[in-house]
């Protein structure tokens, strides 16, 4: 969250998508022994509402679907990597070129810049 705060303080726009929020809720409400945060429903909702207050949601649209389909075919995307392709499709449709992610290697196949959050803090 420090890296997001740094971007916001610098005046950089920071966005989220339904995909980001659903992945957050999945991890937030998953039990700790199962690699989750173990948040209650109420705590997860509170954190989601904080995100909504500070960041801008990028909407899904038929154009996002078309771009996602193009990407998964062009890059032969398989399995859970289709979720990364959906993020990139949303970015492409909305003209966004950079993504903040701990999994930078998952985005190397795409024509975007993947930035690790820790790189903004050094």
Regions found by a protein language model. Give the residues of each.
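Short acidic, glycine/proline-enriched helix-loop-strand junctions
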Residues: 47-65, 69, 75-76, 107-122
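Active-site neighborhoods of divalent-metal-dependent phosphate/nucleic-acid chemistry enzymes
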Residues: 31, 56-104
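Short, hydrophobic secondary-structure boundary micro-motifs
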Residues: 17, 37, 57-61
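Short, well-structured N-terminal submotif of metal-dependent ribonuclease cores
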Residues: 1-16, 31-43, 105, 109, ...
């Amino acid at each position: 969250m420090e890296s997001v705060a740094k971007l916001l303080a610098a005046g950089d726009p920071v966005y989220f998508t339904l995909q980001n929020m659903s992945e957050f809720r999945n991890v937030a409400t998953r039990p700790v022994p199962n690699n989750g945060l173990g948040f209650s429903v109420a705590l997860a909702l509170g954190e989601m509402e904080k995100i909504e207050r500070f960041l801008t949601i990028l909407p899904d649209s038929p154009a996002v679907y078309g771009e996602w389909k193009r990407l998964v075919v062009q890059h032969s995307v398989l399995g859970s990597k289709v979720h990364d392709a959906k993020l990139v499709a949303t970015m492409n449709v909305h003209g966004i070129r950079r993504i903040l992610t701990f999994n930078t290697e998952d985005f190397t196949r795409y024509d975007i810049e993947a930035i690790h959050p820790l790189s903004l803090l050094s």
